[in-house]
Amino acid sequence: MGRRNRRATRHGESSKSALIDCHIPEEHFLQSTDPKEKTKNAGGAVEHTPLMKQFFAAKSDYPDLLLFFRMGDFYELFYDDARKAARLLDITLTQRGSSGGAPIPMAGVPVHAYEGYLARLVALGESVAICEQIGDPALAKGLVERKVVRIVTPGTVTDEALLDERRDTLLMAISRSKQGYGLAWADLAGGRFLVNEVDSADALEAEIARLEPAELLVPDEDNWPEFLRGRIGVRRRPPWLFDADSGRRQLLAFFKLHDLSGFGIDDKPCATAAAGALLGYVEETQKQRLPHLTSIAMEVASEAISMNAATRRHLELDTRVDGDTRNTLLGVLDSTVTPMGGRLLRRWLHRPLRLRDVLVQRHHAVGTLIDAAADADLREAFRALGDLERILTRVALRSARPRDFSTLRDGLALLPKVRAILAPLDSPRLQALHAELGEHDATAHLLISAVAETPPLKLSDGGVIATGYDADLDELRRLSTNADQFLIDLEQRERASSGIATLKVGYNRVHGYYIEISKGQAEKAPLHYSRRQTLTNAERYITEELKSFEDKVLSARERSLSREKLLYEGLLDALGTELEGLKRCAGALSELDVLAGFAERAQALDWSQPELDSAPCLRIERGRHPVVEAVREQPFEPNDLDLHSDRRMLVITGPNMGGKSTYMRQNALIVLLAHIGSYVPASRAVIGPIDRILTRIGAGDDLARGQSTFMVEMAETSYILHHATPQSLVLMDEIGRGTSTYDGLALADAVARHLAQTNRCYTLFATHYFELTALADASHAGGASGIANVHLDAVEHGERLVFMHAVKDGPANRSFGLQVAALAGLPKAAVTQARRRLAELEQRGGESHSAQMAPTALDAPQQFGLFTAPSSAAQEALQALDPDELTPKQALEALYRLKALL
């Protein structure tokens, strides 16, 4: 009993309350048996106590989940569950009784605070089965009946307390075939269900990086890509659950349809298989209907700008490379007022669109809000809006709480004001959103008349339904209300008749109404008082009059709560019929919140409306880095960018800390912002078609995959060379620095040539290899590769080094590496030694090395003399051929390839 006493004292509960409330005798804990630790009775059979039988029966259905086993005021965990929970939650691991001569490990959390513990477990990727007492302990003869009523997993949570209000919580399923992978994901808290198909593991990794699912379902098979192995939240399921035919049947049955053509997935078997597996898992864990999932949508990859996982990480969209979420693009951009608006903005940020018409409408809407000064009015109205999207989900799942109703009521009451703000605005998108808001006056009136102004947290507290809504409920409440005056009058009468001035009339939930007299006055108690309870310092009594009153009042209160629950269920039914329109309304309000936030940011930060051009170009005038500008105290130095068909690559040189990486990132972020519908931090931005943003910036060892810094660098570079197109924007920062000087220089040169000649993408190529600046001269000689030099400079002022942060045409003439080292605090002796060594190197071979590394044309690789007797590409291809293995057709194709290499 030591553990129970300690915990009960901490939570202010009786040490035996849980056992008494559950009618679980102490001996039910003793001699109980874990199946792994069997104890046999005299007949040789394994024997369990009633409590342990009940626990094992529930646990056997959910062997891989933590089981929260309700025992009165606590949820208990036993055996391995207890050990795991104690470690993850930092709660006490204790024991009670024994099993097979060994103690029974136990850990528990109080019911009134369990949501906090549950949230921590879910965040760690754990799933929990909630086993509740479904019988009334007061009526139970023996053990209280229990049943698993709910399963909480990282991807299926809908409770407000378990969710991040500004981030989607997604459940994803992945199937695979010879053609690639099928993905399905659902936001149960928001009512969204989507699918997609990708053709490679790289594309799959990019989608997972974009969506960041909390839970991932995959077939229990081998050879999954490495990035999935060991990932938190991955759950292996039987492979037969990922069958395309059964998935199709499951979707048809769920949506009550005859075909899936309306969803656009009839010819997507891999995505259909994933969707069926996901839907089956949701139905299995939620144990109820899911009326808020009304459709399934196919995401089309070509409609969005592609960004792989490395690009998202390098650009620090919502999380910095070090894991911090502050000082990110989202942190600067997010001016939304509502949680649902914040979630929509995050989705837009991670899926910038290529749909020019959609983006132009968004830009125009933002400009209209600014011109009409309507953004401030909208944002002020939205401050009282609440998270309608998730509230509607809880309404659909019939788990809405009283204050969800009042928040929904107050939100719907704002619609006339929002419509009035939008009505005069001349913007196609704003008028479309105005129409999507719909008319919900009847629903608003219902909630205004039915829900109390400030309802309690729980329905069981009573007082949720407004006075005047239901006559029967009002009558029952009058009985309870008049009870207070009756008790005051009774107390005064009894004090007068008994002569006991300290006599009190009170009530508690265990013993009901009572008359309390102190121990010192107890001998004066009238004869018609019947003792009800003895306390340390007082005696409590009951009289016939008080008993009669108690029966009447308690009956009225019970009937009042019962009536209120019935009316509450009626409200859920009524709202259920309006869900579709209300969901569209919530979606429109979310988008309006984002657009109004864009307008606020544009004005506060002096951003301008971008121009989306159909011609290939990327022209940015006086562009700034949105995050760096926001966090630094000094004015930000704006810079231009001009790329087009004849100028596709900039080789960027300059000192460390000069701003090369900032310059590259700011241009990528400006492009991204333009493609979500936002204004951009530039005086002007003209942006042609962009299909991908690919980056190779910075590096670090990937210890989990056993990859060095250089290996990570080469893997990311390889991805870019294989995927960049003439419409891609590529950022390359310091390629080759992770290996020896000559190897690094050779690789950097080869990568730059490949990007310029083969990929022909827009490229910002920052480097410390000054030899690469000769590529621009070779570009002019070759005529077609469009390479130019720009640099960022610094000036020495006495012993100080001042970085100018201005981008200028031409190559840098100094690196200032030693000056930067001195700024970093290297000992003066080390810097002096470095200066001497640099002078020796420059005198000994710097000039000849530079001459050797200066090719005159991009099509003359034989001039690049770093390696002994370099073979030509044609020679290498010819040596790789095996004539005996070639068919006539393959031989002819090989001949054409060889000719092209000459």
From Swiss-Prot:
ATP binds at G654, P655, N656, M657, G658, G659, K660, S661. It holds the Pfam family MutS_II. It comes from the Bacteria. The keyword DNA damage applies. GO terms for biological process: mismatch repair. InterPro entries: DNA_mismatch_repair_MutS, DNA_mismatch_repair_MutS-lik_N, DNA_mismatch_repair_MutS/MSH, DNA_mismatch_repair_MutS_C, DNA_mismatch_repair_MutS_clamp, DNA_mismatch_repair_MutS_core, DNA_mismatch_repair_MutS_N, DNA_mismatch_repair_MutS_sf. One of its GO terms (cellular component) is cytosol. One of its GO terms (molecular function) is mismatched DNA binding. Keywords: ATP-binding, DNA damage, DNA repair, DNA-binding, Nucleotide-binding. PROSITE patterns: DNA_MISMATCH_REPAIR_2 (PS00486). Belongs to the DNA mismatch repair MutS family. HAMAP family: MutS (MF_00096). This protein is involved in the repair of mismatches in DNA. It is possible that it carries out the mismatch recognition step. This protein has a weak ATPase activity. This is DNA mismatch repair protein MutS. The lineage of its organism: Bacteria, Pseudomonadati, Pseudomonadota, Gammaproteobacteria, Lysobacterales.
